[in-house]
From Swiss-Prot:
Predominant location category: cytoplasm
UniProt subcellular location: Cytoplasm
Role description: Regulates arginine biosynthesis genes.
Annotated coiled-coil segments of the chain: none
Protein name: Arginine repressor
Keyword Repressor: yes
InterPro entries: Arg_repress (IPR001669), Arg_repress_C (IPR020899), Arg_repress_C_sf (IPR036251), Arg_repress_DNA-bd (IPR020900), WH-like_DNA-bd_sf (IPR036388), WH_DNA-bd_sf (IPR036390)
GO molecular function, one term: DNA-binding transcription factor activity
Record carries keyword Cell inner membrane: no
UniProt-listed GO biological process terms: L-arginine biosynthetic process; protein complex oligomerization; regulation of arginine biosynthetic process
Pfam families per record: Arg_repressor (PF01316), Arg_repressor_C (PF02863)
Keywords: Amino-acid biosynthesis, Arginine biosynthesis, Cytoplasm, DNA-binding, Repressor, Transcription, Transcription regulation
Pathway: Amino-acid biosynthesis; L-arginine biosynthesis [regulation]
Amino acid sequence: MKVTRHEKILELIERKDIETQEELAEELRKSGIEITQATVSRDIKELKLIKVLGEQGKYKYAAIVKNENDLSDKLANIFSHSVVSVENINNFVVVKTLSGSGNAAAEAIDSLNFKEIAGTIAGDNTIFIMARTSEQAFEIVKKMKRVIRERGV
């Protein structure tokens, strides 16, 4: 049942711009799959779905592509389109994102594999990054700003 449900979720988000868990649950019900909001939430986590900016300017669920080059490019785009500000304080970097984008942006940061990053912690709209030194925190900020500039944001 779970595998079938996951396949249906992936099919639905590929065909339709689904913005909320409630919309996804409703579409699944229309397809004959009875589901609770809690199960939808778990499925989203298990499938590692992310929210991306759709063509209509609204955020929608999307699956992470398996191709490593496509994945890196998509994550860099997610990062550059969701970050509001980046600043360093001592050996920490604080990244502010659009509301609800913290986890996706943190995943993108982790995928950039900056050697200066010791670890990241993400919230709804804020990411804390720990660098090993204050100099490395400054370098992380420079690199992040470069990624944002290169993406034309």
